Amino acid sequence: LWYYDNREDLKKVVRLHGKSTERDFYVGEKHRDEIIAMDTNHEGFPDSVHGYSLKSDRIEFLKGNNPENANYIAKFSELNTELCHILSSRNNALAQLYPPDGHISWHNNANASAYNIIFSWSETGDGCFKYIDGHTGNEVVMQDVKGWQCKAGYFGAYGEPWYNRV
């Protein structure tokens, strides 16, 4: 919860990606269907994200020459290393802090297929994780609850894509 506890300070130094006004389109059925129709022409990454990227190789600061930037990167590295050790994980693909109207658009992760563990914390329980079950083709909604939740699963490569959005 360090990021959540320090969210007001983070907002002053970390760039907020994307626009909340785009959310309905990018998490909607029309965009989902467009991404699925692209098949292997979809590169795997989401087209739109509205949130703060916190991973050290993706974080963007509002001021590039702020001496505090190094402290944020060091803190992320410390927390990321600790989490990877606890989980016996080699990589962490994503670390995001979403504003109340945040999102990640429909995508398939086929460019980085792997087993995933997704930890999220919700203040209100209003968010959700949606995915298309790669075996049945059905859309599944995993509604957030207040507090912590954990989701685990396999995001497949091309030929077995697992379309999802937050």
Which residues make up each language-model segment?
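Catalytic core of non-heme Fe(II) oxygenases with the double-stranded beta-helix
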Residues: 89-162
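Detector for Asparagine
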Residues: 6, 41, 65-71, 80, ...
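Short, intrinsically disordered, charge-balanced linker/junction segments flanking boundaries
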Residues: 1, 163-166
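Non-heme Fe(II)/2-oxoglutarate
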Residues: 1-87
